[in-house]
Design a protein with these regions (language model features):
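Alpha-helical scaffold segments in soluble metabolic enzymes
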Residues: 86, 120, 124, 141, ...
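ATP-binding N-lobe of GHMP and related small-molecule kinases
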Residues: 2-111, 123-135, 164-165
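Short, conserved phosphate/pyrophosphate- and ester-handling motifs at nucleotide-, phospho-/glycolipid
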Residues: 114
């Protein structure tokens, strides 16, 4: 008999990457809090895919990550991928977990790939908890991870573009 699943065993998200046309830099908190800001950007048909799944407790490690490198670790603090580590710290999902990414474009392409990753991973973690969240909430959480937790000198357009698309 089929059962409804409120907490899935696996989730895959697809997050768009973006092009910025104007206003880059006006989305930095230090700027827009004093002067306001406006950006013109659009997402493109190039995506970052994030899969989060529960892996078997038969594996020796608690967290398995596969992106341009592979990590097998037992604690959050051991995770080298800082965005993944802090997203997991913010939205706790009981391990053991496997996180894999694939992208249509290479990292450091200048098209917001780290923010697309943060947005996709946060959506997936919420889904693993059975939570349906808004694009605005995920965009703000991704900004919190990258700007507040990781202290990256970046603005907010990438996270919002990826979360809302368009």
């Amino acid at each position: 008999m089929p059962q409804s699943v409120t907490r899935p065993r696996a989730v895959t998200t697809v997050s768009p990457q973006r092009l910025s046309f104007a206003g880059g830099g006006t989305d930095f908190p230090d700027f827009y809090q004093r002067h306001g800001g406006a950006v013109i950007s659009a997402t493109i048909n190039k995506y970052l895919y994030v899969t989060v799944k529960r892996h078997s407790p038969l594996f020796n490690e608690t967290y398995r990550l596969s992106y341009f490198k592979t990590e097998h670790v037992n604690t959050l603090d051991e995770i080298e991928n800082d965005v993944a580590r802090e997203c997991l710290r913010l939205i706790h999902v009981d391990p053991p977990l496997f996180i894999a990414t694939a992208a249509d474009l290479p990292a450091s392409s200048g098209l917001g790939s780290s923010s697309s990753f943060a947005v996709g991973l946060l959506y997936a973690l919420h889904a693993m908890r059975g939570e349906n969240v808004s694009a605005g909430q995920v965009a703000e959480e991704a900004c919190h991870v990258e700007i507040d937790m990781l202290k990256r000198p970046i603005g907010k357009q990438d996270q919002y573009a990826s979360a809302f698309g368009g």
